[in-house]
Amino acid sequence: MEPSSPEPQAGALTVRPSSLCIAQVEQNHTWDVRASAEVALPGRSRPASRVPCKDMAFPRNQKLNLLRLTVLLIVALAGIKFIFRDSVTPDLHKHISKDNDFWGKAGEEKEEANPHNQALELSAVKIMGPKEDTKKQLSKDFSTTEMRLVHLDLKGAAPKVSYLEQVFPLLSKLGANGILVEYEDMFPFKGELETLKSSYAYSEDDIEKIQRLAALSKLEVVPLVQTFGHVEFILKHDKYRYLREVERFPNSLNPHLPDTLSLLKSILSQVMDKHRHSSWIHIGADEVFHLGEGMDSKNWISLNNGDVGKMYLNHIKEVVNFIVNQYKGLQVLMWDDMLRKISVGAIQESGIPKHASPVLWFYAPDFDTEQIGKFISKYADSGFKSVWFASAFKGTTGPAQAWTPLNYHLKNHLSWLKVIQAMSKFPFIKFQGIALTGWQRYDHYSVLCELLPVGIPSLAMCLQTLVNGGFTEATNKKILDVLGFQNIHLEKSTCEGNGAFPGSEIYRMVEQINGQLKESIAKVLEEESAIKGWFSPYHRKHQFGNPRNLENFGSKVLKVHEDWENFIQNFRSQLESIYFPDTVEEWMEENVNPYMDRLREFVRDYREIIRLNAKPKAL
């Protein structure tokens, strides 16, 4: 809830005109205190002084004394105003609007509340929405432009800005004209929202630089802010736990608490105030897990004929209305999956289609295009003026996927091409663009999917397929020329050549780790018969062995270990040039250390035991 203009409260400095012999300034209904005034100090009050005037004759000395008294009062007033000037403003800021029922009316005794409500009230004091001053976005005309947005999922493995500086020109060259930036905890939230940001969050200067770099490559920047589901990065914090739809799960917001909307307004305002040149904002709103399971929602549903869809729309309507009223000219995008279950009439009644566009997302290689057509017809009937689609170039084939399957994602885009080419069947709704999603995590708590450099060959194929209307010979040639490869093997998901794109070193090294690290270590440790016979886990546990037998396999194991350690050291350096330390450590822990640690422990035991020169086993 937004605070209204505060009224003066007890303890604040006030200046009251005396009732007689003062000069009233009629303009603006203000008072000229030069003639006579009375100062009311905090905690005190006294009757206004009565100063006789007109037709009253005074001796000369009395007139002088009165003049001196007046001067002294003016000086005293000025001094008191100076001393107390800093105490007035904070008191006014602390005032809570008496018109805000959630906070309770000023001067009234609050009703006794249950502990749950008390907890909400105490926490809610910290969440004050922004002052709603209407702001105008920079107007651009995209009426004849089909947008191709590349999704940057920054909830994991967020690249350094220096890497984005290299990547943006590549995206433009491949056919993108925008980026969909899902900041999550990488945005430099400040004030009460500072809790939300990561230790490695971008700075405000970084956000500005990202937009400047995007503009240089003619890429429209579309920020994405989740406003209902997938808000784990918010609800994981104790400070905001009470806003969960279901207390156990941090996935979705409770739409019935006033603080939910106040918090979202603050988040949206901070993000949009840093994106004044953006034409769209994406509010997420997909996969609102457990909606309707919270007690507040159950109570609402029981009073509204079980209409969960209407409950969903009510919340989205509040979010959309705030955006369009606060930022004139800004257009809203939202994922469509929750809308699929809601009736046309309910969507029409909500008014959302006036200001928002649904983004239909399907990531499978051969999805049902006829079903997509039914959804498009539904959204046209609901009153939406335009529709967007969402494909995937990486991050949808498994939560721990490290290597991108090229053919899988190419087929997904070929399916979307069929839909795009059939849009003439839907004259009452316009196709505005497609977002090529590149998910980095399935959610805030999952491990990393494919790194961005690993997904670039797939992204290049998908973008060029959309640009050229298919995966043609010309498409293939353009991809090879831009990326610096000699050939692409779709079924094997590999590319011939070293590559010459930003991050190509990481692409090649991840390919080796993904295809060779586990196998080479398993081969040297498990397939060597001498190890099974003379250096078993039992030998290692009791620290005994014959050097004559150990040396039969030792040099081979040591060579494999040395080669991989050198490789991993180089790989880590490449990662550190693009990613922040937390990403480097996470990727190594998940994809390298489980195999390398096994080899390292083996080599450590080997070196210790061979130095013992065939001593008896330790008991």
PLM segments and residue spans:
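Short, low-complexity, Lys/Arg-enriched N-terminal segments of secretory-pathway carbohydrate enzymes
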Residues: 19, 28-64, 97-111
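Extended acidic/polar, glycine-enriched regions
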Residues: 68-74, 83, 87-94, 200
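Aromatic-lined carbohydrate-binding surfaces of glycoside hydrolases
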Residues: 144-360, 391-403
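Low-complexity, intrinsically disordered or signal/transmembrane-proximal segments
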Residues: 9, 24-29
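Short glycine-rich, low-complexity segments
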Residues: 1-5, 13-14
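Boundary/entry segment of secreted carbohydrate-active catalytic domains
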Residues: 104, 127-128, 132-158
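Substrate-binding groove of N-acetylhexosamine-processing glycoside hydrolases
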Residues: 57-72, 79-84, 126-137, 165, ...
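Ser/Thr/Pro/Gly-rich low-complexity linker/stalk segments immediately outside membranes or between
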Residues: 85-119
